[in-house]
C-alpha cells in the first residue's frame, strides 16, 4: 500500500493506512556489500529495475549480511556466499557460549534461498618466485584474507580448516600509505598485494605469503596484475581436497581474462545466493512474495540493463525450475512457488559485451604496485 492510496480516508482508517505503509517501509531492505562489490551492484539493479522501494544497504561481506538479516530491523534479503552456512554450523557445534550456539541454530533453521546467482572464483595469489605451486602448499603460510566478516575471510578460513584441520596464520588487514581505493576492502587487497611483490619493504607484521581474493570473473583487480605474481592451482589429489567439493566446485581461471596467467588455471569456486528467512510476520512475508513477483516480472529488464552477472542466473521464466542447492540449504517456501510458476515474456534481450583487459585503464597507482603488464 502506498501513501497516495491513503488519501480521502477517515482519520481512523487513515491512521491504519499510514501505519501499514510505515510497516512496509520497515521491511524493504537488502544487505549486499561495499559499493565496489558486484553484490552491491546486484542490489542496485534490483532496486532500479525490479523494486524501486527496495533499500540497498552496504556491508563488510557475507558474515555481516547474515547477521544483518537475523538482527537488523527491516532487512528482508541478503546476498551471501554459499559456504557461509558452514560457518554457522561450526558456531552451532563449537562455540563456547550457549547463547551463540542457540542463535546459530535458530539462524540455520530460518535461512532460505530465493535463487542462486552466479559462481565466484577463489584466487590464492603468491609471488612469481614462490616455491608454492598449488593450494595444498599454503599450510603454515601467512594469509592476507581481509577483515573479519568479509567473504574472503570466511572462505579462506573454511578452506584452510578443511585442508589442514586448524586455523590459518592471518595477517591483520592494513592500508599502506599512498594506496587508494573506493573502499577499505579494496585498499586492504591492494596493500597486501603490494607487500607480496615487495617482501623487503615495510614492517614485519604486514608481510604476507598468500593473498586470497574472491569474486565473479573477471575480477578487475586480477586483470591488472603484472609479472611479479602467480596463481596457485587447485588440484583434487587427496581426501582433504576432495572433501572441499561438498561446499565448493572446480572451475578454470581464464587466461584471456588475466594476462599474468601462463594458461587456464584450475581454481575453487563458491556460489553466491540471494537469500531471505522464514519470517513470522505476515506483512514481511507479503513483502517477500511481492519481491519474488517483481523478480519474475522484471527478469528481462535485469538481463538487458543490469550487471552482466545476471546472465549467469540458472533460473529464468523460460526455465523456471530452480536448481538443486548445496548441502544444508533450502529454498524459501514463500518465493519458490512464485518463481517456479513464472512465465516468460515475449521480449528477448541482447547480450552485453564484457570489458576486456585491454580496455581497462592502467592508473599510475596500479603501475606503482606492480599491476598491469
Regions found by a protein language model. Give the residues of each.
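An extracytoplasmic/periplasmic, membrane-proximal ligand-sensing/linker region
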Residues: 190-194, 198, 205, 210-211, ...
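Pocket-flanking alpha-helical
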Residues: 42-48, 57-108, 189-203, 216-226
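Pocket-lining segment of extracytoplasmic ligand-binding domains
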Residues: 130, 165-284
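Bilobed "Venus flytrap"/periplasmic-binding protein-like clamshell domains
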Residues: 27-50, 120-199, 317, 327
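Ligand-binding clefts/hinges and TM-proximal coupling segments of bilobed small-molecule sensing domains
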Residues: 141-159, 248-321
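N-terminal signal peptide c-region/cleavage motif recognized by signal peptidases
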Residues: 17-21
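A structural signal for short loop-to-beta-strand junctions that line the ligand-binding cleft
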Residues: 102-117, 257-266
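Bacterial N-terminal signal peptides that target proteins for export
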Residues: 1-11
